[in-house]
């Protein structure tokens, strides 16, 4: 269970959000909406433990993040605005390297299977810089298939995806929820999601 208790977030001297409280339990998806600059990314980074709230607390399984940082990171996948993969490596080697850094024991066969699901099997040996932005985004999202993590925090995961890719992403999130996973996301693109809760920033 992920809880936000009376959270406040700032950027510089500007307060982006205040007194934000919610709770997400297994099987739920929290969708965060708001205009650009309303604090969506700040909120997601705070929930991931990468930013310190101006006030309030984030709890995981009833305990503050600071008391269980390493354990929390092993149960979390954070997919931010950036792709987070190296331009000079191919998709296969990128995902193998990323999994090793994340401490996930995956085989080449597992990575190839994930690339096949995201439609990149034929491009797995191409240098990453030669892929389109949509293909790069799909390669980045393939990590969700490889990492067995309970909580997904996804910042605009549908960016650069076409209609097919967005539909696949919605189905993937639904599968994760059906297995007891939790999701927090922002998206400008309409996704077919079983959303349990909505937070509107700047309202």
From Swiss-Prot:
It comes from the Bacteria. ATP binds at residues 34-41. One of its GO terms (molecular function) is ATP binding. One of its GO terms (cellular component) is plasma membrane. One of its GO terms (biological process) is cytochrome complex assembly. It is a peripheral membrane protein. Belongs to the ABC transporter superfamily. CcmA exporter (TC 3.A.1.107) family. This is Cytochrome c biogenesis ATP-binding export protein CcmA. It comes from Pseudomonas aeruginosa. The gene is ccmA.
């Amino acid at each position: 269970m992920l809880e936000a208790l009376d959270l406040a977030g700032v950027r510089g001297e500007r307060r982006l959000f205040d007194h934000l409280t919610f709770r997400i339990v297994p099987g739920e998806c929290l969708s965060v909406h708001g205009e650009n600059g309303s604090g969506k990314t700040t909120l997601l980074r705070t929930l991931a433990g990468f930013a310190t709230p101006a006030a309030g607390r984030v709890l995981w399984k009833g305990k503050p993040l600071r008391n269980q940082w390493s354990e929390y990171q092993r149960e979390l996948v954070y997919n931010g605005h950036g792709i987070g993969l190296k331009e000079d490596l191919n998709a296969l080697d990128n995902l193998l390297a990323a999994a090793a850094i994340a401490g996930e024991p995956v085989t080449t066969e597992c990575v190839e299977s994930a690339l096949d699901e995201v439609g990149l099997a034929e491009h797995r040996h191409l240098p990453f810089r030669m892929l389109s932005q949509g293909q790069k985004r799909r390669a980045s999202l393939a990590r969700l298939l490889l990492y067995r993590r309970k909580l997904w925090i996804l910042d605009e995961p549908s960016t650069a995806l076409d209609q097919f890719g967005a539909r696949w992403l919605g189905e993937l999130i639904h599968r994760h929820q059906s297995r007891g996973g939790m999701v927090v996301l922002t998206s400008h693109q309409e996704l077919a999601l079983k959303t349990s809760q909505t937070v509107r920033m700047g309202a």
